[in-house]
Amino acid sequence: YKRQSKLAARAKERAALEKDPRPYGGLAAEASLVAMQEFVPSAFAKLDVKGCDKNVYVATVLPGASAALIRDTEFGGDAFVGLQVQSHTHNPGRDLAFALNWVKNNEPGATLESTAADGSEPKLEELIDASATLDVQVHQDFDWWIPEGAQVTPQIAQSLRAANDSVIESHQVGENITGAAFWANAGGGKAHIRWVRPNDDESAFLNALARVAARGELNLGEGTKFAGVFRTHGLIAPVFDLDPEVDHASYEEHLTRVDKALEEEISNDAQLSADERKQLENIKSRQVTLR
């Protein structure tokens, strides 16, 4: 019996050390969650949590980069769970499940500092509906941190000012595309669109990017350039450089065109031509792994 419990404890330790290749895989909200965790400064989205009677919102970042908070009853008692947190494990999907489970079982006024999952959390799919999508509300400041009518202490006001000063203008783009794309202007004379586009076959997706690039169509119109890809949370996110003076809403048509071209090429299993191979090497040389 002793040996069995030792083996079980060891197996549990091993499981905790393993990294989930796609922490949000299997969820319709996968791309939105990844984008909010990695690319979007200030945003939140309502998330229905099974068996929870509170309004729950998943957010990019909360005051102090804390994991979760439940507002006092006098301010509505809504709960917020942060994705960009100070304290976490290498498995963001389990961390989110841990924080959502905490929200479910705690009272208004409570705050969770660390989101680090400890193995006590249920599976994410047991807490949220896998087919639910997120309606992401992007903000250009963090004023939503403060509930209406709440007292703002000088300390809170100062931290809010600092947070607001750090916000990069961002907007969601691409109404009808696969995944989630966000435009951002970080300054330096260039704006970007980062497009989290889930695909189950990584090499087929990279080949599709190469084929579309070889045709000269991997761009979002005049004055734009394909910059490379980010790898994060088991997904590939193409990035485009843009003119910051051009309105973010003007890329809809081009995003839809590129999305359609990629979708058609993903199922193309013919050998790559010499030019397509060259494009593939170029794409691979411009990839940055975030986590």
Short names for language-model regions:
Residues 13-71, 132-160:
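Short Lys/Arg-enriched alpha/beta "domain-start" segment
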Residues 195-200, 240-244:
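Short beta-strand-to-loop capping motifs
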Residues 223-291:
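Alpha-helical oligomerization segments
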Residues 180-182, 193, 228:
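Intrinsically disordered, Ser/Thr/Pro-rich regulatory regions of eukaryotic transcription factors
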Residues 1:
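Conserved small/polar residues in nucleotide/adenosyl-binding loops
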Residues 199-231:
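Short, internal acidic amphipathic alpha-helical interface segments
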Residues 4:
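Arg/Lys-rich, low-complexity, intrinsically disordered N-terminal tails that contact nucleic acids
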